[in-house]
Amino acid sequence: MTIVNDLLNQMPGLGQPQRKFLATLFVTILVLRGRVNFRTLSRYCDYSERTLARQFREPFDWPDFHQRVLRTALDPCAALVSAHDASFIPKSGKQTFGLGHFFNGCASRAERGLEIATLAVVDVTRRCAFTLAGAQTPPGEEATQGKPEDTRVDFYAQQLRAPRHRLPPSLTYHCVDGYYAKKQYIDEVAKLDLHVITKLRSDADCVFLYTGPHPKRRGARRKYAGKVNFQDLSRFEDLGTREDEPHLHLYTAVVWHKPLKRRLRLVVLLNRKAPAQPRFIALGSTDPELNGHRLIDLYGARFQIEFLFRDSKQFTGLLDCQARAAAALDFHFNASLAPLNLVRAEDLGMQQGQEPHVFSMASWQQCQFNERLLDLFMEHLALDPTWVKNHACYEKLRAYGAIAA
């Protein structure tokens, strides 16, 4: 990866030993085979287990580093949205910081372990997500910082508030799943001058807004025109079907959401693939002027954050943390997400102008491993690196075993 050293050199207050360690760490994570823990890392680099454990406790400004990668990779004029989600990390023991019961989507129930909450920026056109901030969710009372009136949702809101100034200036929409469709979270996002796009409950308590003439009588003007019934969509505007999915019918209306106490652009996707049993989902946005089709496209881009969790768990060792202290855990989680940002940024530069954007983390990791192995051959066999890298078979050997996306 050619951009690592340039980005680290730009960061103020970063000493040469830590700069060298981070550059080595990112490359080592991509080339190693096995679990990403201190022992395995020590087998693939010149640092001992003790040195690795000590460096993982050193402070580092991860949001600043992630932001610098974003500036390198993303076009500020492109369509961008932010996404916020959490992922469960299984962990045993008694002394690990943050152990608690968190929801595990794979098991569809709460289990004992850790949770990492991630704020990402998504390029809507190229369907590519980049981590901006990752933090461990404290369990129980620690998540509320001792304030009984606070909840875990307030912790997520605080995680969004802190790096708000690092989001691209052109970004105006924040996409989250249905868990975050709560008043305290939506209000916090609105204070940050962002519009929320989220999934709503199938029985969301919404009412139509009254737009007719007001009779001349005493009293307040009429505001509402009846409760929304998702089984009867005759009062919604019919937007037709999706071009790529003709079985999906779209209906939209501007409604008042009673629990959130605000106007929403409501879009209902009706799935008529099985005409006898049609199914629907409801999406909402705090921007009433947002086009219904555009709302669907922006919300669909939110799922790119799931690929960050998937790739970091499969390839960069998000689940393999050997540490127990809070600082070391935070370092490990961000160190697992950072190589994904770097690889995606370099891949976007190589595929500049190509549509659609094709990316395979498995191929990148295989190529990095092959390149490292070839470098070791050249070093220990006293081969001329210039001659080897200019050989016609070098790229073939470097891409040996790569998996196409």
Short names for language-model regions:
Residues 1-9, 15-18, 27, 32, ...:
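Single, function-defining residue in the core of a domain
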Residues 16, 43-55:
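Short, basic interhelical loop/turn and adjoining N-cap
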Residues 39:
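Residues within the helices of the helix-turn-helix
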Residues 51-54, 64-76, 153-161, 171:
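Hydrophobic, well-ordered secondary-structure segments
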Residues 53-58, 327:
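Short linear loop/turn motifs
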Residues 57-133, 138, 250-256:
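Active-site-proximal, Lys/Arg-enriched surface segment
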